[in-house]
Amino acid sequence: MFSLTQILTFLLVAITLMTFSSAQPIDEERPIFMERREASAFGDIIGELKGKGLGGRMRFGKRSSSPDISLAEMRAIYGGDQSNIFNFK
């Protein structure tokens, strides 16, 4: 059969070949994206409050509480009648 030295040599060569054949640059092929979480139990709530307080956008596509144009500016542009604000002709 095979001696212990031959078996160990074969295993060493096989492991070495498998190691070098499967090695690929991790940072170039598959970047690691880690989900950022707060450490506390209220991490999601704290994150939402931080985002709103610093003027960040809200999640899930909702608009922020301060629109780009105020109602007073819209009245000045389109007149005092509110019925034609969104009636573009």
Curated annotation (Swiss-Prot):
GO terms for biological process: neuropeptide signaling pathway. Keywords: Amidation, Cleavage on pair of basic residues, Neuropeptide, Secreted, Signal. GO terms for cellular component: extracellular region. It is found in: Secreted. Each flp gene is expressed in a distinct set of neurons. Residues 1-23 form the signal peptide. Belongs to the FARP (FMRFamide related peptide) family. This is FMRFamide-like neuropeptides 27. It comes from Caenorhabditis elegans.
